[in-house]
């Protein structure tokens, strides 16, 4: 039997207007009513919003081999670094998954966090690897520059600003930010200036390492939402860094000499064999790194202990740079071909031109990061001319264009259509 309101009317849902007879259930509140259909609709909207917010679905956590295969689509080479990162990231989020689902452990073992230290020269993919990992897992990602950090109270950025970048990347969703990834670049620049502790304060070196310790290990940090220096009286945001994965990267110039001195491969002493520069490989040397080498380099023991996973990225040779130009999904050649395609022009690179671009990047010592700058230089004149040339159909880049700065070959549209017509006739014959 339907209940009657004070005015004698049937009770209705305050949202959809359906009466009590038209729905299965009508729930009363202070002066309002909501039906079961509206409740179901609200649940659907909430689930959709949660899905769009990009929370990690722990039951779908990719396995290390799947992570490696995904990285292969975007990053060329670096097989060992990919393997180490895939395992470390998988174990990190598996640990969070176990805590989130409350999975019981037989002996109640508490799983510790394993942050990562990436060694390797500039332009070899350290930052790109971390960015690609975060994109695959759909977690917030922030990049911080260690060279700008100083101890609290000194001119420069506080270490808490790193967490502010992560919170901003998560659209101020603290729960989501607490499972994000932070990449701290140029971490070798915060090494203390000498191996022995100094009586003078090292505010941008050892002082920063000390300030980062609790954050790396896991603590509830107070983060000023507008930056702590200019707005000292603002309310702080609290964020727990226990489940934030930290990846630290740096070139560590000079570390190879420390490792060689320890392993006996250096050239010191009367009986030592002097190795030619061509025999030495920084990549092979970095693969033998030990915590004691990092200590001699200038990192404090507590900081090294909070980065248990140490791996290195290898220098990029000529074939690897050519692969970077052409093979990844967002390869540079594909990007520029797409730009020309928007103007209705086909862009074509000869193999010799790609090799010349790779050689130039190696000469400059900028690695993969320098490839775009070289491409811009090579294509500047043609990118200036082609949009105003309606007759241009195809642009051909060869070795001479790259090395001798000659103008590329622009094939007119009439010639291209005539050639394609001839090819069609040959096929039909």
Swiss-Prot record:
GO cellular-component term (any): HslUV protease complex
InterPro entries for the chain: AAA+_ATPase, ATP-dep_Clp_protease_ClpX, ATPase_AAA_core, Clp_ATPase_C, Clp_protease_ATP-bd_su_ClpX, ClpX_bact, P-loop_NTPase, Znf_CppX_C4
GO molecular function, one term: unfolded protein binding
Classification via Pfam families: AAA_2 (PF07724), ClpB_D2-small (PF10431), zf-C4_ClpX (PF06689)
Biological process terms in GO annotation: cell division; proteolysis involved in protein catabolic process
Keyword annotations of the record: ATP-binding, Chaperone, Metal-binding, Nucleotide-binding, Zinc
Binding positions for Zn(2+) per the UniProt entry: 13, 16, 35, 38
ClpX-type ZB domain span: 1-54
Family annotation (NCBIfam families): clpX, PRK05342.1
Main function: ATP-dependent specificity component of the Clp protease. It directs the protease to specific substrates. Can perform chaperone functions in the absence of ClpP.
Subunit structure: Component of the ClpX-ClpP complex. Forms a hexameric ring that, in the presence of ATP, binds to fourteen ClpP subunits assembled into a disk-like structure with a central cavity, resembling the structure of eukaryotic proteasomes.
Family membership noted in the UniProt record: Belongs to the ClpX chaperone family.
Name under which the protein is recorded: ATP-dependent Clp protease ATP-binding subunit ClpX
Lineage of producing organism: Bacteria, Bacillati, Actinomycetota, Actinomycetes, Micromonosporales
Encoding gene (name): clpX
């Amino acid at each position: 039997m339907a209940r009657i309101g004070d005015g004698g009317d049937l009770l209705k849902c305050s949202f959809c207007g359906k009466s009590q007879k038209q729905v299965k259930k009508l729930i009363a509140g202070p002066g309002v009513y909501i039906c079961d259909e509206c409740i179901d609709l609200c649940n659907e909207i909430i689930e959709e919003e949660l899905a769009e917010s990009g929370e990690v679905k722990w039951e779908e956590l990719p396995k290390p081999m799947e992570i490696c295969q995904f990285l292969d689509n975007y990053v060329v080479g670096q097989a060992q670094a990919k393997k180490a990162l895939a395992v470390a990231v998988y174990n990190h989020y598996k640990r969070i998954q176990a805590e989130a689902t409350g999975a019981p452990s037989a002996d109640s073992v508490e799983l510790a966090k394993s942050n990562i230290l990436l060694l390797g020269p500039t332009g070899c993919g350290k930052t790109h690897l971390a960015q690609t990992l975060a994109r695959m897992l759909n977690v917030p990602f922030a990049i911080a520059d260690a060279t700008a950090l100083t101890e609290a109270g000194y001119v420069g950025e506080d270490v808490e600003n790193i967490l502010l970048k992560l919170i901003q990347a998560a659209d101020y969703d603290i729960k989501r930010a607490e499972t994000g990834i932070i990449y701290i670049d140029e971490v070798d620049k915060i090494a203390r200036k000498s191996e022995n502790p100094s009586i003078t304060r090292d505010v941008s070196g050892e002082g920063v390492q000390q300030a980062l310790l609790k954050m790396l290990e896991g603590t509830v940090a107070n983060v000023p939402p507008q930056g702590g220096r200019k707005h000292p009286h603002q309310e702080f945001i609290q964020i727990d860094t226990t489940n934030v994965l930290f990846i630290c990267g740096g070139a560590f110039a000079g570390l190879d000499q420390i490792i060689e001195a320890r392993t006996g491969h250096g050239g010191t002493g009367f009986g030592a064999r002097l190795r030619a520069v061509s025999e030495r490989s920084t990549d092979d040397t970095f693969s033998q790194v030990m915590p004691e080498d990092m200590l001699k380099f200038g990192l404090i023991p507590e900081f090294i202990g909070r980065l248990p996973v140490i791996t290195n990225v290898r220098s990029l040779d000529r074939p690897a740079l050519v692969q970077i130009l052409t093979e990844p999904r967002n390869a540079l050649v594909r990007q520029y071909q797409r730009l020309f395609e928007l103007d209705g022009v086909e862009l074509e690179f000869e193999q010799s031109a790609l090799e010349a671009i790779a050689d130039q990047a190696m000469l400059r010592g900028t690695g993969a990061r320098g490839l775009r700058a070289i491409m811009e230089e090579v294509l500047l004149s043609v990118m200036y001319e082609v949009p105003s040339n309606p007759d241009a159909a195809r642009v051909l880049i060869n070795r001479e264009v790259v090395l001798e700065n000659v103008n590329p070959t622009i094939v007119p549209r009439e010639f291209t259509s005539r050639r394609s017509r001839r090819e069609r006739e040959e096929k039909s014959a």
